[in-house]
Design a protein with these regions (language model features):
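Conserved SAM-binding loop of SAM-dependent methyltransferases across substrates and taxa
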Residues: 1-12
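Short helix-capping segments at alpha-helix termini
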Residues: 10-11, 33-38, 79-82
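Residues at the starts of beta-strands that form the adenosine-phosphate
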Residues: 13-14, 40, 86
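Hydrophobic/aromatic beta-strand patches that form the interior of the parallel beta-sheet core
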Residues: 16-18, 44, 88, 125
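S-adenosyl-L-methionine
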Residues: 18-58
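Class I S-adenosyl-L-methionine
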Residues: 50-51, 56-59, 68-184
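A short beta-strand submotif of the Rossmann-like class I SAM-dependent methyltransferase core
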Residues: 62-63
Length: 184
């Protein structure tokens, strides 16, 4: 859906969409045809940035996977990453792992945002590779972004509250003295 949106809203003239599995690409092909944009979307099978040639794109969107996998994709194709104007990253889990990697590995954070979909929060990053931009933060700031704190995002308070609730549940689980917990 993202490639179709980019074309239909004149954000991009041409889009390369890739996936490691054939089925999502087949669905994308059908959706692109239904929306009349098949000629502007190049569908490619492959994982990570592998299907992309070096210097072929200005920007890349990596979304719908965990922060660990996004980090690995960036690390595995650093030559391609260095030649991009920017990347949009949306980890489905572990955004703190990705944030720490970005800060410690020469990425400039251009923007960060939050969204919520079906009661699940998602963090979004707009970044670019910039040699010499190594920054180390206190560990709490990998969990809660200083960028988002400074922007005072509307969803930030409820996002932090949800993280606190989740951590309280983990603490309750590991300190539970029920018979079942004792057996664990």
């Amino acid at each position: 859906y993202i490639p179709i949106y980019l074309i239909k809203n004149n954000i991009a003239k041409k889009v390369i969409a890739s996936d490691i599995n054939k089925e999502p690409l087949n669905k994308a092909k059908i959706n692109a045809a239904l929306d009349g944009v098949s000629d502007k979307i190049d569908l490619r099978l492959g994982g990570g940035l592998y299907p992309l040639k070096n210097k072929e794109a200005q920007a890349v969107i990596i979304a719908g996977m965990g922060g660990n996998l996004i980090r690995d994709i960036l690390e595995n194709d650093l030559d391609k990453v260095r030649n991009l104007d920017y990347l949009i990253l949306q980890p489905a889990q572990n955004p703190e792992v990705l944030r720490e990697y970005l800060y410690k590995n020469d990425y400039e954070i251009l923007d960060e945002d939050l969204c919520i979909d079906e009661n699940k929060y998602y963090e979004l990053f707009k970044v670019r590779y910039k040699k010499g931009d190594y920054i180390s933060l206190e560990s709490i700031f990998y969990e809660i972004s200083p960028f988002m704190l400074n922007k005072k995002l509307p969803l930030l308070k409820s996002y932090i509250e949800s993280k606190i609730d989740k951590n309280k549940k983990v603490i309750e689980f590991i300190t539970d003295d029920t018979e079942h917990a004792i057996q664990r």
